[in-house]
């Protein structure tokens, strides 16, 4: 895939990992998607480790997205990512302790920016403040950002466009990407990556799970 617009397939529905995640990945491992992940809840750790190991065996880049807002829970999520051998930790509210832990363990860290609350998450805050927050975290050495662009309570298109044009780091637009219209918007602003989870389970891109993955992959490559 190109340098940007990487599809991250999330084996999640309504911000929770589905129970049959392993089975779905097994069926779809030969799809065109190279980036795969899921959430920190509710699979037991041993099942998470088994699935990540199988993903890595199949040459995938792996993500754990942690939808937690306290330092303690965020750090627990980071520890889980390391224990599972994940490539990239997405989510958590930024804390220096999490950032330092990720650096020490060679885990790429892409925290949330802005005011993120609830589950499924929503994003609030002024666009300029969100961008300035990201710049501060970049100075502290984060790899990139988990931007909940389509969960934003303000001007979504302006946030996504302004954030990506102002931040020189990998940006993943995560959450609520559920139609070709949004894929076309993403093609225009060209983020490093985007996630799709629930929309695949709700058959928003027509076909089997694997067919939907390939439809999305091919659409953003056009």
Give residue spans per PLM region.
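Conserved anion-binding
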Residues: 59, 67, 72-152, 221
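N-terminal small/glycine-rich loop or linker at the start of catalytic domains
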Residues: 1-12, 52-60, 101-122, 156-165
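Glycine-rich phosphate-binding active-site loops on the catalytic face of alpha/beta enzymes
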Residues: 84-97, 140-152, 176-177, 182, ...
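Hydrophobic faces of well-ordered beta-strands that scaffold small-molecule active sites
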Residues: 5-12, 36-38, 62-66, 88-91, ...
